[in-house]
């Protein structure tokens, strides 16, 4: 029987306490980051910088100088997209295959350099009943645009959660018609290449 993991619903507790504890449990080895991932709650909201140091996830409030990737989530979409994904993935499988945006923490310097050349925002538009939830990913030098991203990935919540679990790859969902790419697909492909 698997242990029930309590997932906090505030971004501060989730990022500063829960996520580092999950990394510690996962034992990701002695990997250190080539740079930081910036997590932003709302387009002009609170920010946290995340990085790996000898396998431990360090999360600090504010923007680090060496940000590689930005993840922006509207405040109202944090629980439905981030917390819900954590709840369905808790305790199952490899952490890095579950949390897409966190994968960038382990990339090497060469891939980090390639990621820095990406210009544009990839924004998931996730259909959740009557609501559309959004989470945007952009390289460090590009300001994220949730309203008019250069590339939009549209899917149902169930498919988004499958991606987060690591049980479906985005390209598999594109091929089956369950994930629709609108706009510049090249941006999504360039970002994806940095993770593999």
Predicted regions and their residues:
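Feature captures hydrophobic
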Residues: 1-196
């Amino acid at each position: 029987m698997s242990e029930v993991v309590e997932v906090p619903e505030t971004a501060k507790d989730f990022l500063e306490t829960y996520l580092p504890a999950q990394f510690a449990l996962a034992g990701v080895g002695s990997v250190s980051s080539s740079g930081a991932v910036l997590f932003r709650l709302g387009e002009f909201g609170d920010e946290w910088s995340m990085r790996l140091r000898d396998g431990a996830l360090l999360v600090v409030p504010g923007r680090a100088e060496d940000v590689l990737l930005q993840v922006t989530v509207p405040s109202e979409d944090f629980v439905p997209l981030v917390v819900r994904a954590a709840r369905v993935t808790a305790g199952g499988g490899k952490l890095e295959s579950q949390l897409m945006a966190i994968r960038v923490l382990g990339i090497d310097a060469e891939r980090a350099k390639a990621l820095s050349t990406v210009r544009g925002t990839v924004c998931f538009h996730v259909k959740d009943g009557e609501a559309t939830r959004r989470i945007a990913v952009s390289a460090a030098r590009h300001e994220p645009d949730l309203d008019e991203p250069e590339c939009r990935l549209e899917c149902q919540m169930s498919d988004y959660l499958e991606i987060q679990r690591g049980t479906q790859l985005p390209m598999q969902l594109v091929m089956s018609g369950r994930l629709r790419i609108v706009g510049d697909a090249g941006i999504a492909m360039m970002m994806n290449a940095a993770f593999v």
